[in-house]
Amino acid sequence: MNLKNFIVDKIKRTDIYQNKKEEAYYSSRSNMLSMLTPDEKSSSKRHVYFKKSKADEYNKMFGLINITIRFGNRFQTWIDTGLYFSNIYALEDNTTPDYELILDNSINDLINRSGNYNNSVSYEVQIMLRGILSYIDRIVEEIQEAILTLKDTADIDRLNNTKTYFLRMKDQKCSSLEEALQRILFWSSLFWQSQHTLVGIGRLDKVLARYKLDIPESVQIIGDFYSEMHRYFAFKSSGKLLGDTGQIIVLG
């Protein structure tokens, strides 16, 4: 790194620089954020600034995200719209995560795979994945607390299913259509939360082909998945074009 790049890097790591970026973000997104529904809006603004490493920044984010549990829903997904995640360098946007990787592997599987590469990148990946494990523990605790407040059997059953799906993310691969869609929603939310935009869904037919799709409720399950994807559409919208979320599903 030459002297100029070294100085620029140091400046970008300062609170002053990142605060200016945060102010510019909220200014440019004010119209979109004003269109959030009441349950999508955050009651407070907080931020996670880049300091030492990206893995540390992500882990701080995982610890600060406000978890929103919605009773009566088949799936649970949320974005903490009041939590700003600082990116001091350009992001790769308009991309589709490798959902097959997270459906066919648990987080512990991914940690073990990453451990096969003895380099700084694999070390950072392992730190971040362990942070996700801690985040899932928080989610499970929130779901369990929500269950204790309920009396409706159907709502309790739905949340118990969701709790099981989150627990299985830690050490098991997906085994059903519903579980796979919940896992896709969760991992997609991590990209949105960290300021990525135009997060695609990809070849959903190929990704889901391994699961039993001819069950009577499969149409309803997929419909509920679409409804969850539509949540936070104002937050997800790119630029000034409302609805341009990039959540494109490719078939065939």
Feature locations, PLM:
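Long, non-catalytic protein-protein interaction scaffolds
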Residues: 1-116
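Mature, well-folded catalytic/scaffold domains that follow N-terminal targeting or propeptide regions
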Residues: 41, 70, 141, 147-252
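N-terminal leader/propeptide and maturation segments of large enzyme subunits in energy/redox metabolism
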Residues: 89-157
